[in-house]
């Protein structure tokens, strides 16, 4: 197992169509439109042409984190993550203290997804997301719920306890929709989530919780 051999994690089991761009590779069919989706090879090429940093910006990744990828990780820790990730179908929940590398791990997942050809990705720091949802107008509140609910891969960093009723409703609505529609959510926290409804939806659909106790990632300039 190498750090570039991660394709099995995100491969779709159903391959029914032919790529409409290259007309040679097998691909999946869009559930809603019935049309063939671009194959992985074509999506990879398109993302490379757009630019990885541009796609990270579109995904709301903080600029300071653009440099991080799977190569920032200790080899032994990497193997443990691959093993755990191979077991989860939709949701992945990271738990650990401050400065243990949870956010960097999430960014490494995003980096891999982009290089694998995905572009329907969003990253949000939860306190910032909730603040934006409450201070803006009602239409923007609904826009954020719709955006977070329907994106293919959602990454929620720094989930915390003590949500007020409106914050709880906002987060619950997003997570519940994603679970019902089998959309993957990757979350991270440095506390034990004590809200049973929120916690259960972070781990539904064969979700996996990984506890991170040590700082296993390396700085980019130490690769």
Outline where the language-model segments fall.
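A short, basic N-terminal segment
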Residues: 1-79, 210, 217-223
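Pre-Walker A adenine-sensing motif
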Residues: 77-87
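Short glycine-rich substrate-engagement loop in P-loop NTPases that contacts/grips substrate
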Residues: 79, 114-150
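Walker A/P-loop nucleotide-binding motif
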Residues: 89-107
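P-loop NTPase Walker A phosphate-binding motif
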Residues: 104-118
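Loop/turn-to-beta-strand initiation segments
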Residues: 119, 150-153, 180-187
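Alpha-helical transmembrane segments of helical membrane proteins, especially in multi-pass transport
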Residues: 153-154, 161
């Amino acid at each position: 197992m190498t750090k570039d051999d991660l394709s099995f994690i995100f491969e779709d089991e159903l391959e029914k169509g032919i790529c409409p761009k290259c007309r040679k590779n097998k691909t999946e069919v869009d559930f809603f439109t019935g049309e063939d989706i671009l194959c992985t090879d074509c999506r990879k090429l398109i993302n490379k042409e757009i630019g990885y940093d541009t796609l990270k910006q579109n995904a709301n990744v903080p600029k300071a984190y653009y440099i991080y990828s799977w190569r920032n990780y200790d080899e032994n820790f990497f193997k443990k993550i691959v093993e755990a990730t191979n077991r989860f179908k939709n949701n992945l929940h990271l738990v650990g203290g401050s400065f243990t590398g949870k956010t960097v791990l999430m960014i490494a997942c995003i980096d891999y997804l982009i290089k694998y050809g995905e572009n329907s990705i969003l990253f949000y720091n939860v306190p910032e997301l909730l603040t934006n949802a409450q201070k803006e107008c009602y239409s923007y509140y609904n826009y954020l719920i719709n955006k977070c609910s329907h994106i293919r891969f959602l990454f929620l960093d720094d989930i915390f306890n003590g949500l007020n009723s409106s914050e709880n409703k906002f987060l619950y609505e997003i997570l519940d929709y994603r679970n019902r529609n089998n959309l993957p959510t990757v979350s991270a926290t440095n506390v034990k989530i004590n809200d049973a409804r929120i916690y259960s939806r972070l781990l539904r659909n064969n979700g996996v919780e990984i506890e991170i106790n040590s700082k296993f990632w390396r700085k980019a300039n130490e690769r």
